[in-house]
């Protein structure tokens, strides 16, 4: 498989990049204000009286330290004007922390190492659009909070008629490192070569925002990511992008906790249930214009993922 690596410093800003950036900024300004600083400080007010018992073992007393790859709108991204993390996931975990009488500090993480960093106690928990799968469950436990599938983002009109990953043989495609989408593209590429076709020409980048920029700059013909991300960029750029084919591989995403940290797991589960029952969860879906089918219900059999 062909893999092309790029660094941020090697790329020059384009009109397309500025257009996407302006629209993202506009969307954030229209959304309700709030968020947590990506690098550390939390400008949120003092938490109210706890309604959920807080965990007993925190990295910093009084603070829930949260790892998140803040390059994945609409779930987690950074407001360029304030440097604060924002998005559905950020709002949710901040409200959950407040229900435990804690402040939330969001630490920008590398998605490719985020699980190992949690195990190494760099964070108390991780919320970062993590699909729950068997490989990750070997290292951490999950409290599901969201459901998402995978989809292709292509140029408006879908000029190459791309419907599934099997249509990508020999084509340039962008994807974020460490994701289930990368795994699926690797599998599809092997199927291409087994059928006597060219491998998929993958450009694998660390940040999802940079992956989308590849499509803006016409360096790839498609990108592959979680369906909410695809939907988000289509909404931000009317007439520029569309979904290629259907959403596939719908699966739960979870807030991850170190194995054996029963106090943290129970607190996160109880706090999420609180958000689900008091209307906060539903209000955040409305705020971020998410699809109701992506909700995880209190009665969902996937409420706990441990092994």
Across the structure, where does each feature detected by a protein language model lie?
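C-terminal motif of bacterial Sec signal peptides marking the signal peptidase cleavage site
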Residues: 27-32
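Bacterial lipoprotein signal-peptidase II cleavage site
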Residues: 33-43
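Extracytoplasmic small-molecule ligand-binding "clamshell" domains
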Residues: 47-129
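Bilobed "Venus flytrap"/periplasmic-binding protein-like clamshell domains
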Residues: 68-73, 85-98, 130, 151-207, ...
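Periplasmic-binding protein-like
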Residues: 70, 147-156, 227, 235-272, ...
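Extended ligand-binding regions for polar small-molecule ligands
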Residues: 90-99, 158, 166-172, 177-179, ...
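Acidic, polar ligand-binding/catalytic clefts
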Residues: 94, 103-167
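A ligand-binding cleft/hinge motif common to bilobed small-molecule-binding domains
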Residues: 112-113, 130-138, 185-188, 216-249
């Amino acid at each position: 498989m062909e893999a092309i690596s790029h660094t941020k410093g090697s790329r020059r800003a384009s009109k397309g990049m500025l257009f996407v950036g302006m629209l993202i900024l506009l969307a954030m300004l229209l959304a309700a204000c709030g968020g947590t600083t990506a690098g550390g400080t939390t400008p949120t007010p003092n938490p109210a009286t706890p309604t959920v018992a807080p965990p007993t073992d925190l990295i910093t007393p009084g603070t829930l330290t949260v790892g998140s790859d803040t390059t994945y709108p609409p779930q987690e991204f950074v407001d360029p004007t304030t440097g604060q993390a924002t998005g559905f996931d950020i709002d949710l975990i901040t409200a959950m922390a407040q229900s435990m009488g804690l402040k939330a500090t969001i630490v920008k993480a590398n998605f490719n190492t985020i699980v190992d960093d949690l195990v190494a106690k760099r964070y108390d928990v991780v919320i970062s659009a993590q699909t729950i799968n068997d490989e990750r469950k070997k290292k951490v436990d999950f409290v599901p909070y969201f459901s998402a599938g995978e989809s292709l983002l292509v140029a408006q009109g879908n000029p190459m008629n791309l419907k599934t990953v099997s249509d990508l043989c020999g084509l340039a495609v962008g994807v974020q490192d460490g994701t289930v989408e990368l795994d699926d593209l690797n599998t599809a590429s092997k199927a291409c070569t087994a059928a006597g076709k060219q491998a998929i020409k993958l450009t694998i980048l660390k940040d999802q925002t940079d992956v989308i920029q590849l499509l803006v700059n016409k360096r790839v013909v498609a990108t592959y990511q979680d369906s909410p991300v695809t939907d988000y960029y289509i909404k931000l750029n009317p007439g520029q992008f569309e979904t290629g084919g259907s959403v596939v591989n719908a699966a739960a995403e979870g807030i991850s906790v170190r194995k054996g940290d029963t106090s943290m797991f129970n607190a996160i589960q109880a706090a999420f249930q609180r958000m689900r029952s008091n209307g906060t969860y539903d209000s955040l879906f409305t705020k971020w214009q998410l699809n109701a089918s992506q909700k995880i219900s209190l009665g969902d059999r996937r409420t706990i993922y441990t092994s």
